[in-house]
């Protein structure tokens, strides 16, 4: 039964990854080896995925359209049921991060609206149920003592945290990637992991992005 469940799980993942493929681009596919493959989730936090989060006004429609919250949970659940390793790459800002001498436009915005704010690296004061905290329904999966929570990335990609090191130390060279947001942290993680020699597949309905007057971040991520 366990083997059957594992095969079903891998089939679902492959199907989900393949739901959005441009007709003129080849689909290289991915042979998933459970011994070498991990699920990586970027920013599964309230500020992105909760209606109370500071970005919900621009990401909410995309999250709902893709059933992102539910689909990320399905990834967590399936991974845990099949003993596939899970890594979470979170986004936190501490007080010292607000003292940067120069910032990009989105950094200014994130700091202005208090996105992912924490009191400090060594305290959980005011952390519970804050915008930086995990979405409540994900906590049983993330806080089970098995999920690897990396150090926080500060901008978009894993260049500023220890995700690559943690993956390599676990013998992982294949990554199934999901999380928030599609055209920023998720895409940046994808590109850097590929540059680092990992084989990466993105679950396209387990992510979402901002929709603003200038365009749809999710569509931009899929096209790129």
Residue ranges, per PLM feature:
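A short alpha/beta connector and helix-capping loop motif
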Residues: 35-37, 52-79, 84-90
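Active-site-adjacent betaalpha module
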Residues: 23-38, 47, 65, 78-82, ...
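Bacterial N-terminal signal peptides that target proteins for export
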Residues: 1-8
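Short catalytic/ligand-binding loop motif for oxyanion handling, primarily in non-cytosolic enzymes
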Residues: 94-98
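Bacterial N-terminal signal peptides
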Residues: 8-18
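Short, well-ordered beta-to-alpha junction loops that form the rim of enzyme active sites
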Residues: 89-92, 180
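Surface-exposed, active-site-proximal loop segments in enzymatic domains
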Residues: 51-60, 100-103, 193
């Amino acid at each position: 039964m366990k083997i059957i469940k594992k095969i079903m799980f891998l089939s679902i993942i492959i199907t989900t990854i393949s739901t959005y493929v441009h007709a003129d681009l080849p689909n290289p596919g991915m042979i998933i080896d459970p011994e070498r493959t991990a699920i990586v989730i970027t920013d599964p936090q309230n500020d992105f995925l909760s209606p109370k989060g500071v970005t919900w006004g621009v990401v909410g429609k995309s999250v709902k359209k893709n059933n992102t919250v539910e689909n990320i949970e399905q990834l967590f659940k399936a991974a845990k049921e099949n003993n596939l390793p899970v890594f979470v790459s979170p986004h936190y800002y501490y007080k010292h991060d607000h003292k940067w001498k120069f910032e990009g436009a989105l950094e200014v915005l994130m700091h202005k609206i208090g996105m992912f704010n924490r009191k400090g690296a060594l305290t959980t004061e005011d952390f519970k149920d804050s915008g930086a905290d995990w979405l409540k329904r994900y906590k049983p999966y993330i806080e089970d003592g098995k999920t690897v929570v990396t150090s926080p990335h500060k901008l978009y990609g894993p260049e500023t945290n220890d995700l690559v090191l943690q993956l390599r130390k676990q013998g992982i060279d294949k990554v199934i990637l999901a999380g928030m947001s599609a055209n920023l942290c998720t895409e940046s993680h994808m590109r850097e992991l590929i540059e680092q020699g990992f084989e990466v597949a993105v679950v396209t309905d387990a992510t979402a992005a901002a929709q603003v007057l200038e365009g749809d971040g999710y569509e931009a991520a899929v096209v790129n």
